[in-house]
């Protein structure tokens, strides 16, 4: 029988490292609550990014998925994860930096992605995962609360921006619940939150997502400027394009919907 999460980590003398952005969760009931939001079943194939000392890993395995592949950069955690694997043969362990992995080499069928993401790579990794949306059933991600609010933000709100647009052209997004700093060791300075991201049945192509990235980078750099001014260098006939799409030339970045940005990208 496995010891508690905290005792297991202590037995391997694993303390959180700042360079990996580690904040461990030792509360198994919180881990179970997070995994319940994923709706995984015995037929699910799951990828967990950054399992650390295995809190979420255990809760996933209790659901008895068809397979669970964990990707961990910290070699100190591998022996601990190997011990968990001894009880759960459906667990596969990859020691690698997820940012250096070609995810398409790992995913051969629809998967659920679960992660307590380090804050410093959260946004970058979310966008990378969105570009593989056709291979993903859903994602349950723990991120900084502010980032989750940006992902879920509606047009004409303060939090609405590039990340909101990119996420919402690819997927349905839903904030599940907040997680207090006291749930982690060590305590971060800010709240976290759980977000559920469910890719659309027919998400945009990677090429189209890249175009939306390019457009939103320009317009949200000057979010109070009119769209026609922000995009003039990228799209010389921007006035005609916006008029054709029935988008007000005088609108600002925060006024356009994700669908509006997708429609503009399709004209490039």
Swiss-Prot record:
GO terms for molecular function: 16S rRNA (adenine(1518)-N(6)/adenine(1519)-N(6))-dimethyltransferase activity; RNA binding. PROSITE patterns: RRNA_A_DIMETH, SAM_RNA_A_N6_MT. It is an enzyme of class 2 (transferase). Belongs to the class I-like SAM-binding methyltransferase superfamily. rRNA adenine N(6)-methyltransferase family. RsmA subfamily. This is Ribosomal RNA small subunit methyltransferase A. It is found in: Cytoplasm. The gene is rsmA. Specifically dimethylates two adjacent adenosines (A1518 and A1519) in the loop of a conserved hairpin near the 3'-end of 16S rRNA in the 30S particle. May play a critical role in biogenesis of 30S subunits. Its main location: cytoplasm. S-adenosyl-L-methionine binds at residues 23, 25, 50, 72, 97, 116. One of its GO terms (cellular component) is cytoplasm. Gene3D superfamilies: Ribosomal RNA adenine dimethylase-like, domain 2 (1.10.8.100), Vaccinia Virus protein VP39 (3.40.50.150). InterPro entries: KsgA/Erm, rRNA_Ade_diMease-like_C, rRNA_Ade_Mease_Trfase_CS, rRNA_Ade_methylase_Trfase_N, rRNA_adenine_dimethylase, SAM-dependent_MTases_sf. It catalyses: adenosine(1518)/adenosine(1519) in 16S rRNA + 4 S-adenosyl-L-methionine = N(6)-dimethyladenosine(1518)/N(6)-dimethyladenosine(1519) in 16S rRNA + 4 S-adenosyl-L-homocysteine + 4 H(+). SUPFAM superfamilies: S-adenosyl-L-methionine-dependent methyltransferases (SSF53335).
């Amino acid at each position: 029988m496995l010891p508690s999460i905290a005792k297991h980590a202590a037995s391997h003398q694993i303390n959180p490292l700042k360079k990996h952005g580690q904040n461990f969760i030792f509360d198994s009931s919180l881990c179970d609550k997070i995994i319940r939001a994923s709706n995984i079943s015995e037929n699910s194939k799951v990828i967990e990014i950054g399992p650390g000392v295995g809190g979420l890993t255990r809760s996933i395995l209790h659901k008895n998925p068809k397979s669970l592949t964990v990707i961990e950069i910290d070699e100190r955690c591998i022996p601990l994860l190997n011990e968990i694997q001894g009880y759960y043969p459906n667990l596969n362990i990859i020691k690698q930096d997820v940012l250096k992995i070609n995810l398409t080499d790992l995913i051969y069928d629809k998967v659920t992605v679960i992660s307590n993401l380090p804050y410093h790579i959260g946004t970058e990794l979310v966008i990378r995962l969105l570009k593989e949306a056709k291979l993903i059933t859903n994602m349950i991600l723990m991120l900084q609360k502010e980032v989750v609010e940006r992902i879920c933000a509606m047009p004409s709100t303060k939090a609405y921006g590039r990340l909101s647009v990119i996420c919402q052209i690819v997927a349905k997004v839903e904030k599940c619940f907040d997680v207090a700093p006291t749930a982690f060791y060590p305590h971060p300075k800010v709240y976290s939150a759980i977000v559920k991201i469910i890719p659309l049945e027919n998400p945009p192509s990677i090429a189209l997502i890249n175009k939306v990235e390019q457009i939103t980078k320009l317009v949200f750099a000057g979010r109070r400027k009119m769209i026609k001014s922000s995009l003039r260098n990228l799209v010389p006939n921007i006035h005609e394009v916006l008029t054709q799409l029935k988008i007000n030339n005088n609108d600002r970045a925060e006024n356009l919907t994700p669908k509006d940005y997708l429609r503009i990208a399709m004209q490039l």
